[in-house]
Amino acid sequence: MTQDKLRNIAIIAHVDHGKTTLVDQMLKQGGVYRENQVVADRVMDSGDLERERGITILAKNTAVHYKDYKINIVDTPGHADFSGEVERILKMVDGVLLLVDAAEGPMPQTRFVLQKALDLGHKVIVVVNKIDRPDARVHEVIDEVLELLLDLNATEEQFESPTLFCSARRGIASYSPDEEGTDLTPLFETIVNYIDPPKGDREGPLQLLVSSIDYNEFVGRIGIGRIERGTVRQNQEVIVCDYHDPSIKEKQKIVTLYEFTGLGRSPIQEASAGEIVAFSGISDITIGRTLCVADAIEPLPFVKISDPTIEMTFSINDSPFAGREGKYVTSRNLRDRLQRELLKDVSLHVKEVGTDSFNVAGRGEMHLSILIETMRREGYEFQVSTPHVLNKEIDGKLCEPIERMVADVPENSVGSVIDKMAQRKGELISMTPIGSRMRLEFLVPTRGLFGYRNEFLTDTRGEGIMASTLETYQPVKGEIERRLTGSLVAFETGEACAYGLGNVQDRGTLFIAPGTEVYAGMIVGQCNRNEDMSVNVCKKKQLTNMRAAGSDEAIRLAPPKVLSLEQCMEYLADDELLEVTPKSLRMRKRILDHSARMRAASKAKN
């Protein structure tokens, strides 16, 4: 295919603004499916977790044909925790679709990714999605997008980018908000006419920058990247080199070459500059390496991936229930699995501490919780500590990561949200009314947001939307209270029964139901006071002839509060761990024995 018939674009949007749905419709209307083929919704979110949570975690590639053009589309994650993915992906494309919700307008992640795209000089097509929402405010949202482009120092050409109005769910787009579209033709036409075809000398020596990695059990690692110059062929011998490490010059061979077609990849014999391709055969290929030929070794510079901001310790499970539910339980299993994750995920850092513990650093709570949930589903059993922020030294001062947090809340909850943010060292920078709601923007330390999402949902009665993205580093802002309450800790090992739980439920909120197996040192609830309390939930009622069988009142138990993985991570204090197995999530104290725990606490006080 000639270069002028190629277009490479990425889709930028905030979580849940509909980018994966839009790609679905582009695939349908680009003739990727047969007429009678039944297709799942959001077909690009192929991982189980992605489909359940409705978010995109890994950037995916696909291609659609329109007339005689081939449009390579890259679907990027909208969540800031996966922004390591976004930065690399933008290097592969020549333009971006900026997708914005017609009611919510541009959100923090949109800002983060758009900044990266503008810095690379990409052309932008603005797409206002969900125009059929009852609370859509199309004209205001367009003004907000223009303000955002001004804020981010867009060039004149980027500022005058074309705007389209669409409903991705119905698969329609139009040039004006007052017209009703019939299909996505306006979108395809704008992409073809406005985005430049890829540049690159097809006759020169090969240069291919690897921007993404896939893994397949049959062929091993698959490199994905864009050919910047020259032509690559199947079975060709290449030199793998690295811009940051001149000593790396390995001779390798490309075994299979693939192009992206619709939802899959098809093997091809050769591809030239401007194409996005995948290849297998180089077992240790990593992101950021360049493929060249022997007589022209010129590695390409690579986008520096932002540093991780939070860290957790992963270690083998040493609780009394260890090894009961998991398939992979040893430190060797854990090490191998984390090393395998590093092959795919560039923004993850793993460091071994001691014999069976690993410090795992990532871009945010979501980033690490997805890793934990994925490992758990694969049959791993391990335990993790509470997340800690990674500080940096800048000009001799210790600085911590600061996030820009945007919250859309009902008017009657504004006071409590501002109050809670102030307690967490948050600084209110703007407050704008949007319909019957308020949009609040804060600059808040990353550690101030740990454990806040639950409180936020309670304060806004489940109606608030919050999102945050890393903004800058500032000197450490002093102490922030993580949790104001203590835990209810099981005193002995056994099975929780209704009588024992009935005696305890007035002391706080229970996390377990009767019949749950517990061990000494396991957390069974949240205490009303700001200190831990040891409780006996296994206590059975003494049955003697003194008590008539019918004279007792039935025990009334409130239903237990069941915590999700993220809620457990947010709940943990420094002296607590989360035990993760394929079947259970159990929170526990680091020191299980009650007396040893008391001694350690008094020692720490003194």
Which functions belong to the PLM regions below?
Residues 1-100, 104, 144, 213-216:
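P-loop NTPase switch module centered on the Walker A-proximal segment
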Residues 38-41, 126, 152-164, 198-209, ...:
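Interdomain boundary/hinge elements
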Residues 123, 133-193:
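Canonical P-loop GTPase G-domain recognition
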Residues 167, 353-367:
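Short glycine/threonine-rich beta-strand-turn micro-motifs
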Residues 207-312, 322-324, 485, 494-544, ...:
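Conserved nucleotide-binding/hydrolysis modules and their immediate coupling elements
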Residues 231, 283-284, 362-368, 411-414, ...:
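Helix N-cap motif at beta-to-alpha junctions
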Residues 260, 265-268, 399, 444, ...:
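Long insertion/accessory domains within large nucleic-acid-processing enzymes
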Residues 319-342, 554, 558:
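A short, contiguous, amphipathic alpha-helix enriched in charged residues
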